[in-house]
């Protein structure tokens, strides 16, 4: 077994760790194994990182062979017991269950007892569709934040490297193995600022204004869109763009400017009346009017309105809205869950900030198949 220590001088927390625990009680951990199935694979490396008065210290417990698995587990347990909170990336799903299973095989009672698990991946998960629509691997977050690596391998690729190392140890293989693990541990320290983006949910926004824009798509068809401008006081490390099928958001970390681009729909909509019993439907005109007005017409001209026929048609230009914020609420059909409002007639500045928040919040409640 080898224990490899390194100090990154003057490294300080990049996010307020105190939100979770005292800084000195936080231990970042990452493990390397010969496979995903804990019952048939072995643990060969446990990496740790923690803050000291001098900086960020890493400590790696490396098993020269599979026979040293119990040794690195025991050494890690003795070291980790000084910390109350373990930080990891998707560790609730893999690292922690794996470690506990292996500790159980060696009758290590009290292994990681009373430690609090802080899964950075779980904390970041609400940002999935705002920032990481393709993948939310740790390396993807590092790339987004502009964090570079010396390591050129994945954990899966290093399995073969370790298996070859067990037979014929080389300095290069050893360096590749520990570099990958150390950079995973160090990377967790570096990606903590990603948590600042969680503040975008229900974020306070200042409405600046809007302007419209016309453009032609690749087929030559002309479209019109509206671009809303907001400002935010939220601090975040990198500018970003996010989009759904019909919305585009651009946020600048330099000045807090947020632009939200929405398509303008030029089509016929319908406004449905909840109090449909107070209306009559006129089939020839395809519209509903109040009973008091209908009764002045010949009986053959009207019929009792139903939920499906108590509507009036509206022509004009419209914007989609996540909630029934701007009235009247319009739709293409009663069963259509999408809501619209007349734009610019029914848009009001007093509700503009709430409108902007509701649009950004869409990214925090999206599901894999959702579209907006």
What do the predicted segments below correspond to?
Residues 1-29, 34-41, 51-372:
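DEDD superfamily 3′-5′ metal-dependent exonuclease/proofreading module
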Residues 46-48:
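Short beta-strand scaffold segments in enzyme catalytic cores
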